[in-house]
Amino acid sequence: MALKAILFLGLFLVVIVSPITVYGGAVCPASSTFGRGSFPDGFLFGATTSAFQHEGAAEEGGRGSSIWDSFTLKQHSESNNNLDGRLGVDFYHHYKEDVQLLKKLNMDAFRFSISWSRIFPHGKKDKGVSETGVKFYNDLINELIANGVTPLVTLFQWDVPQALEDEYGGFLSDRILEDFRDFAQFAFNKYGDRVKHWVTINEPYEFSRGGYETGEKAPGRCSKYVNEKCVAGKSGHEVYTVSHNLLLAHAEAVEEFRKCGKCTGGKIGIVQSPMWFEPYDKKSTSSPSEEIVKRAMDFTLGWHMEPITHGDYPQAMKDVVGSRLPSFTPEQKEKLKGSYDFVGINYFTSTFVAHTDNVNPEKPSWEADSRLQLHSNNVDGFKIGSQPATAKYPVCADGLRKVLKYIKENYNDPEIIVTGNGYKETLEEKDVLPDALSDSNRKYYHMRHLMALHGAVCEDKVNVKGYFVSSLMDGLEWEDGYKTRSGLYYVDYGHNMGRHEKQSAKWLSKLLEKVPDTIQSKVDSDSRKEL
């Protein structure tokens, strides 16, 4: 274990300390060292938060409850854990100082989500609008723009108003399409004159699987044979219904966006959450490795990319899932096709994948349908990537490059924004502040992924326009609670939610420094001499 740690640290030092000369091409400029100047002009660098994870102020300004309020309260009361997500990190009251953190990081952009129930407390416009909630996002957007930071706004990041969940089951019902469309239209009309980058749905794969297949996320529905904690749900069925309605809701919002006069010049997209898959056994003769990887991509990324690009689900899913997979009408297919200006990608890690026939047809599930088995090691014992002891998943930056290239080749070479990429680590209560701030592994993670991204943009010519760190600061990591941290800034939950700069933030701020044109011209000239 000690040797492994030394090797990991050694590799980290080589990557971080050694100067990296980057030679440009048709897409990217040459630069003497790796940094902001290595990427094309206008490339956006930003950081993220989300409403439920960070805002707090759950009962202020007339905000209504969401399914995540209910879910975390239930989990908190049953297990006495630290999962009361209503606390967030009080971004609601600290947003002005948090915008200054973005400036200190030399960030160009900030991605955040709107809490549906903070705007429409009962989920519906005709049941009342919270003007306090409307003002909060208005003030936040103005504060960002006044400080030279571009807002990228997500409409739905998993927090369905509890009122709609109670009324008709949220995304289990197509009744939500009209309510989501009204919410989207309202947001576009209020903020579209200043917000020019919009996301409809964040990670439909994660929301539908976690909430309606495994029960690990709100609203916690699944079959007992999947998760004993679930008290309601139907795995292998509801997951497909919810995904179907998410896609249709996305299309409704995009159609509304296209009509929005204030939104002229803006762009809208959806955020996907793909992993990359490597074959567990490349020498297997029973199941070709290419077919397994393609099936894995179809059941994850393709599930929600094929419909919005080509108008229907992947054939591999239709063949296996059959009647449990809802069908699109001809009109819905036309509305879905091409319903995005960019694709957002949240990427965190990769895995090995193998075919399995070990499924029970009497217990339907997405996992059984996919016939996929995931492994951290391949058949020869090699790991997919390095994984420090506290890390939530292996560091596999090359997977980001492969995912981006896959999207370019399979989905009409779209404009892409890496809307989330971050290192999550679980810290014990005994970990003190100085240890948490010394996050060298997070620096290593982001450097490796930025280098992989550079390869995708500059060598593979993937049309990537931006990179967002997930996240700006620590917050509620959904079902993992507050012990798992992913921020560039440490949040001291026990002392007034104080923000503390981690080493990764200092490093990234330096990396993203804007070089004056006169200095950059000399750098470019010197770089050409080296050639």
Curated annotation (Swiss-Prot):
GO molecular function, one term: hydrolase activity, hydrolyzing O-glycosyl compounds
Catalytic residues of the enzyme: 203 (proton donor)
PROSITE patterns, per the entry: GLYCOSYL_HYDROL_F1_2
A single GO cellular-component term on record: endoplasmic reticulum
Amino-acid positions noted as binding a beta-D-glucoside in the UniProt annotation, renumbered to this chain: 53, 202-203, 348, 477-478
Cysteine-cysteine disulfides: 222-230
InterPro entries tied to this protein: Glyco_hydro_1 (IPR001360), Glyco_hydro_1_N_CS (IPR033132), Glycoside_hydrolase_SF (IPR017853)
Superkingdom as given in the UniProt entry: Eukaryota
UniProt cross-references to Pfam families, sorted A to Z: Glyco_hydro_1
Gene Ontology terms: biological process: carbohydrate metabolic process
Keyword annotations of the record: Disulfide bond, Hydrolase, Signal
Signal peptide stretch: 1-24
UniProt cross-references to PANTHER family, sorted A to Z: GLYCOSYL HYDROLASE (PTHR10353), INACTIVE BETA-GLUCOSIDASE 25-RELATED (PTHR10353:SF178)
Family statement: Belongs to the glycosyl hydrolase 1 family.
Record-given protein name: Probable inactive beta-glucosidase 25
Organism per entry: Arabidopsis thaliana
